[in-house]
From Swiss-Prot:
The gene is rplX. Part of the 50S ribosomal subunit. Belongs to the universal ribosomal protein uL24 family. It comes from Serratia marcescens. GO terms for molecular function: rRNA binding. This is Large ribosomal subunit protein uL24. Keywords: Ribonucleoprotein, Ribosomal protein, RNA-binding, rRNA-binding.
Length: 18
């Protein structure tokens, strides 16, 4: 499951957009 990196990036992006 190499989606951990994507999830981290997505979470970071979400926080930035907030």
């Amino acid at each position: 499951f190499e989606d951990a990196k994507k999830v981290r990036f997505f979470k970071s992006n979400s926080e930035t957009i907030k």
